[in-house]
């Protein structure tokens, strides 16, 4: 019953996955669940259709070229595939957002001077460079840069924290 507005500063959704990182090298397939599992299953379903292949050998060609580097790139028993073209990933993400009823706004950039208004420690509204204002109950900064987080005064670490901080070796 919640509404979600996704604001993208450019014209795309999907981050690195839809911008050129066309394979995932995880070899712990059983650990993939939730939305990630759904995404990789949709990739599998897409490439299971013969009409999407321009090379008559289809998956066999793809597998010979790249599959040896990514644990064969798919798992038929799990119906998941980890090798894909960026435009396929973006289309899958767009479909998932549409099906979930997520409104997407493209080409909006956070105003880095006055872009965050808070009451106490809570963000109440954000302002974009074009002056448009958005109000919500919850804000998630899923950008590469983390500008919303930084402007809101959230503490963060640039680079890797010291091993001693969390008792790592």
Language model features: what each stretch is:
Residues 8, 39, 138, 144-147:
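Voltage-sensor-like transmembrane helices and their cytoplasmic interface
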């Amino acid at each position: 019953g919640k509404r979600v507005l996704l604001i993208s500063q450019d014209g795309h959704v999907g981050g690195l996955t839809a911008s050129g990182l066309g394979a995932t090298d995880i070899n712990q397939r059983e650990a993939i669940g939730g939305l990630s599992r759904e995404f990789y299953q949709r990739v599998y379903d897409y490439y299971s259709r013969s009409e999407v292949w321009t090379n008559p050998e289809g998956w066999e060609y793809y597998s010979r070229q790249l599959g040896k580097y990514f644990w064969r790139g798919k798992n038929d028993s799990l119906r998941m595939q980890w090798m894909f073209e960026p435009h396929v990933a973006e289309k899958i993400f767009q479909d998932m957002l549409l099906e979930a009823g997520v409104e997407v706004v493209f080409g909006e950039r956070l105003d880095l001077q006055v872009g965050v208004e808070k009451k106490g420690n809570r963000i109440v509204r954000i302002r974009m460079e074009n002056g448009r204002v958005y109000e919500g109950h919850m804000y998630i900064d899923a950008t590469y840069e983390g500008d919303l987080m930084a402007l809101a005064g959230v503490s963060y670490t640039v680079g890797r924290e010291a091993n001693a901080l969390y008792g790592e070796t």
